[in-house]
A protein has these predicted regions:
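Elongated, amphipathic alpha-helical interaction scaffolds
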Residues: 1-241
């Protein structure tokens, strides 16, 4: 990636990491947040957002880590990483969430497999923070969300979720969903106009061909995005770059 593309890629991550946009993603893609207002999610549910940062302390009680090399597993670099909680939760952290912007749809391996791996890394990085002394019942659910910009034509405009499930082959058991439903990978394939709100919003936000004032107007008028001054400035700067 040359320097210009790298800087534009960084700008995309910085604007997407604004709480208002993360809140839209959570509400429309993460089932646990669907019943809550976007303004509440943006203000009260999202914390410790980091973009392309390294060497964040792994043992922080509010862990946010982009380059994880814990447990001698090698490095996994995350584009955007944050923790989230439900508005009515007594816990400081309910979810560990990673968001990736993927321009290359054919990097030489299945993106779904990489998403599962990233999810696994977010589970293992909780070892000291959540499951110390083998308290595995405190393991928090992880989401790895992939925004794919150049999907095959026939797959554009789709949203797919890969998650853990159980199959009882013989007899009956009492295993509760909340005890195994700990990892989901969500794939959003952009690339065409879509009636699905989150796809249209992301397509508009990440489309470098739309001029800044037009982009702001679409985000505000069609998607109801209420931006503070800093978010507006970041969006305009990204578009004008």
């Amino acid at each position: 990636m040359n320097n210009i593309n790298y800087q534009y890629d960084t700008f995309c991550k910085q604007i997407l990491a604004r709480p208002i946009f993360l809140a839209h993603i959570l509400k429309q893609c993460v089932s646990e947040f669907k019943q809550f207002d976007i303004s509440v999610i943006a203000k009260d549910c999202i914390r410790d957002i980091h973009v392309n940062q390294k060497n964040i302390h792994r043992f922080s009680p509010f862990l946010s880590q982009f380059e994880d090399d814990s447990l001698k597993e090698g490095k996994a670099v995350f584009d955007i990483f944050f923790v989230a909680r439900l508005p009515d939760s007594d816990s400081d952290i309910d979810f560990y969430i990673n968001i990736e912007i993927q321009d290359d749809f054919y990097p030489g391996y299945p993106l779904s497999a990489r998403g599962v791996y990233y999810g696994g890394r977010m589970l293992s990085m909780q070892y000291e923070d959540q499951i110390r002394h083998s308290n595995y019942g405190n393991l928090k659910k992880v989401y790895s969300i992939w925004i794919c910009l150049n999907a095959p034509k026939e797959e554009r405009g789709s949203i797919t979720e890969i998650s853990l499930d159980k199959k009882v082959h013989v007899g009956y058991n009492r295993i509760r969903k909340e005890d195994y439903d700990k990892l989901s990978v969500i794939l959003l394939y952009l690339g065409k106009e879509s009636e699905e709100e989150i796809l249209g919003l992301l397509q508009t936000l990440l489309d470098e061909t739309i001029q800044s004032e037009r982009k702001l107007a679409i985000l505000e008028e069609e998607y109801g995005i209420v931006m503070d001054d800093e978010t507006r400035k970041t969006t305009i700067y990204k578009v004008k770059y």
